[in-house]
Design a protein with these regions (language model features):
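Catalytic cores of carbohydrate-active enzymes across secretory and cytosolic contexts
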Residues: 1-453
Length: 453
């Protein structure tokens, strides 16, 4: 079986001498290679600015040194840059916050249609390049590619298509007509697929309710399923981690860890404020406590995201100044895409803070639960998708404000040793039972079923 996979980006970077390398990326992109355990994969993605001028095709095994049971080839596609930039702006500033129940800007109708056309154009170009007569079906990932299934259906009417929504679907639908038009636009494209997969049951329900209440959208002939992404437990546990960094914390020192992209939904500023509120009550006789922030700069081409990075840096400085009486620097900011260093921190944390305003899943939570060696506690929020599976074994903040997070941290600190051990055990058991292999197998199974129909 051969499946054509289409995504916004591929995990490909390059060295200073332009040699292709495997680049650690967030979200669903980094787990897509798992599909190659069950089928041959031709993966088509858009060329990012940093990859312009580089080769257009790669063998994944050659650049990653990862071996899968089936072939995995990556193809990069260049599309019209002006349309891509316009679509990216709209996805970043309007669709992304809309899907995460955040405020959205006002738009005029003409502008809205221009953005829709830009997204349609990019989706059509990508889909046309991803078509191959030898493919048995197509798997599309990313809300930015919501219109790809429509083009695939036109060009390959008899091939099965699965669309995976890795973000949430909004839980409260805004009343303004622009927001409704955008959600109808997304849903119309997604409904061209045979199967639509979601991270949580709540997201599936909200999407289903939206379609039912907004004709002429209809679900006839479309299967909706929950298939949450997970982690490759064996690979995670077997990966070599750097020795440096393990000595930065003494055995009795307390580690608070927050790993995220620099994105408003990740609630990093509230996390810093919550720790600061807690640390104001630390005394010199207590073991030292550190909040290590591992931030991957995100969407830095946009002024708002540049501003957020500046705000975070400034907030760290101010908080450390407030806590200067402790005699050490309790908040440490690590900026960059250093997966190995972040993974090493996950083995050592006492408290992993993932209190996003909203999150499709948050794979860091699952990675942390598997890698941690100290019965560390995960402090999260109900709006993090992974909590649908793991919430019973985490501390959930009642509110996603700094005060709410600080209260949850206090609750976590007051847990008994036995409670921590049981929570850690149950987290590992749950993730091991429903690991990445099960997710990938479920994706491929749909194509095998539909192929027979």
């Amino acid at each position: 079986m051969r499946i054509g996979v289409l995504s916004r980006r591929a995990p490909i970077g390059h060295t200073s001498d332009l040699t292709a390398t495997l680049e650690h990326v967030g979200g669903l992109t980094r787990v897509l290679p798992a599909l190659a355990e069950f089928a041959n994969i031709d993966w088509t993605a858009l060329t990012t600015h940093s990859l312009l001028g580089l080769p257009k095709s790669y063998s994944f095994s050659e650049i990653s040194n990862q071996i899968h049971k089936h072939d995995l080839n990556v193809f990069l596609v260049e599309v019209e840059s002006e349309k891509l930039a316009m679509g990216d702006w709209f996805c970043t500033h309007y669709i992304w916050p809309l899907l995460h129940d955040l405020p959205v800007p006002e738009l005029i109708d003409e502008t809205l249609e221009q953005h829709f056309n830009a997204i349609r154009s990019t989706s059509r170009e990508l889909a046309a390049e991803g078509i191959d007569i030898n493919n048995d079906g197509y798997f599309v990932n990313d809300f930015q590619l919501s219109q790809v299934p429509t083009t695939l259906r036109e060009l390959e009417p008899n091939k099965p298509i699965t669309f995976f929504l890795h973000t949430p679907w909004p839980k409260s639908i805004p009343s303004n007509t622009d927001a409704i038009k955008v959600l109808e636009f997304l849903a119309t494209g997604m409904l061209s697929a045979d199967v639509i997969e979601f991270q949580t049951h709540n997201d599936l329900q909200e999407f289903e309710n939206f379609v039912i209440t907004h004709p002429p959208l209809e679900l006839e002939g479309v299967t909706l399923e929950v298939n949450p992404v997970s982690v490759d437990v064996q690979t995670l546990q077997a990966q070599p981690l750097p020795i440096e960094g393990t000595m930065t914390l003494l055995e009795d020192e307390i580690s608070y860890v927050h790993i995220a992209r620099s994105d408003p939904i990740k609630n990093t500023l509230a996390t810093i404020a919550a720790f600061t509120e807690l640390a104001m009550h630390f005394t010199g006789s207590m073991p030292r406590s550190y909040l290590d922030l591992y931030l991957v700069p995100s969407r830095q081409q946009w002024a708002e995201y540049q501003s957020l990075m500046s705000q975070i840096t400034e907030c760290v400085g101010k908080s450390n100044a407030q806590l200067s009486s402790l005699g050490y620097t309790p908040i440490r900011l690590h900026i960059g895409n250093d997966y190995q260093r972040a993974a090493q921190a996950l083995t050592r944390y006492d408290y992993l803070i993932a209190c996003s305003l909203a999150d499709g899943l948050n794979l860091v939570v699952k990675e942390g639960a598997i890698l941690n060696e100290r019965n560390g506690v995960i402090v999260s929020s109900k709006n993090v998708g992974a909590m649908a599976e793991l919430g019973d074994f985490c501390v959930i903040a009642a509110e996603i404000t700094s005060t709410g997070i600080a209260t949850a941290l206090l609750e976590a600190r007051n847990l008994s040793t036995e409670s921590r051990r049981k929570m850690s055990f149950e987290l590992k058991r749950q993730i091991q039972e429903f690991d990445l292999g099960l997710w990938a197998q479920s994706v491929v199974a749909h194509f095998k079923i539909l192929e027979k129909v």
